[in-house]
Curated annotation (Swiss-Prot):
NCBIfam families: PRK00685.1
Lineage: Archaea, Methanobacteriati, Methanobacteriota, Stenosarchaea group, Halobacteria
An MF annotation (GO) of this entry: hydrolase activity
Official protein name in the record: UPF0173 metal-dependent hydrolase HQ_3368A
Protein origin, superkingdom: Archaea
Family according to the record: Belongs to the UPF0173 family.
Keywords linked to the UniProt accession: Hydrolase
Alphabetical list of PANTHER family matching this protein: UPF0173 METAL-DEPENDENT HYDROLASE MJ1163, UPF0173 METAL-DEPENDENT HYDROLASE MJ1163-RELATED
Pfam families in alphabetical order: Lactamase_B_2
Residue pairs linked by disulfide bridges in the UniProt entry: none
HAMAP family reported in the protein's UniProt record: UPF0173
Amino acid sequence: MELTWHGHSTWHVNVDGTTFLIDPFFSNPHTERKPTDIKKPDYVLLTHAHADHIGDADVFTDTTVVGVPEMTGYMESEVGFTESIGMNIGGTVECGDAYVTMHRADHTNGLETDYEYSIGVPTGYIISDNKPTRTADTDSTSFYHAGDTGLMSEMKDVIGTYLEPDAAALPTGDHFTMGPTQAAIAAEWLDVDHVFPMHYDTFGPIEIDINELVEEVGSGDTDATVHVLDGDETFIL
């Protein structure tokens, strides 16, 4: 599984040739890429409708958008997507050679439009190369994109226990989401091997010293390694 961070919360994930673009927003200082530089993904996954998560979604309308039904409905009727997969909390869908499970995120959601529009709830995703199961002993690899969220008990009780991700991209910039301390606790609860900070140093309120996360994880009850990626850097999971 190839994980490429394009800054903020934008990730490109390749699972055995099936490709995903999560929360496309290339107007951030970490990336040198433009959305038009990105090869068409098979799927665009959207966690919620804030502008710093869907800002460049309109560039990828010739692919399949995935999200809560309210989100995918909006993307079809107002943005121009013609193919969509509407799913909801707890659901798993097969996408090419991968499986995508949706989980909730503890955040707000909304759109600035000329009229009221229900856009659904914020979410996160677990992408795996095998279907989640409790009965089969599968050698799976999985990646958790937490979306915008605060610390949630479900990270320990559901995601960590049942879905068992190997790696997690966690918002770390504080103010609007978790900060370094909560993100480090999340890493413990998730029991992941790899932690990737995201949603930090994009604009003033979320500028932090990212070394705080490294120190917090290092002093906690976890063997996870923090990987502070450069913009557009790829990690092989």
